[in-house]
Curated annotation (Swiss-Prot):
Pfam families: Ribosomal_L34e. Belongs to the eukaryotic ribosomal protein eL34 family. It comes from Methanococcus vannielii (strain ATCC 35089 / DSM 1224 / JCM 13029 / OCM 148 / SB). Keywords: Ribonucleoprotein, Ribosomal protein. One of its GO terms (molecular function) is structural constituent of ribosome. This is Large ribosomal subunit protein eL34.
């Protein structure tokens, strides 16, 4: 019987071959999906695709780019938004 923490559907199940030609179930954590732009859905560069615990151990500059809306919007959307805001100001 697996431990309760391994019975989750979010755990990735991998079968490995052990000595004696046995198949053994190994349970791994799934990979985190990449960060996406909030406006257009494009993949964000400079943002690591790690789990929350691992991201919290990184320094602040390694977590997201140091520009306006870094880690939330892609550069194209930021540029568009700034142009629109400047024209409406």
């Amino acid at each position: 019987m697996p431990a309760p923490r391994y019975k989750s559907g979010s755990a990735k199940k991998v079968y490995k071959r052990a000595p004696g030609n046995r198949r053994v179930l190994h349970i791994r954590r799934k990979k985190q999906s990449s960060a996406k732009c909030g406006a257009c859905g494009a993949l964000l560069n400079g943002v690591p695709s790690l789990r929350t615990v691992q991201v919290s151990k990184l320094s602040k500059t390694q977590r997201r780019p140091e520009r306006a809306f870094g880690g939330a919007l892609c550069p194209k959307c930021v540029k568009k938004m700034m142009v629109v805001k400047a024209r409406n100001y």
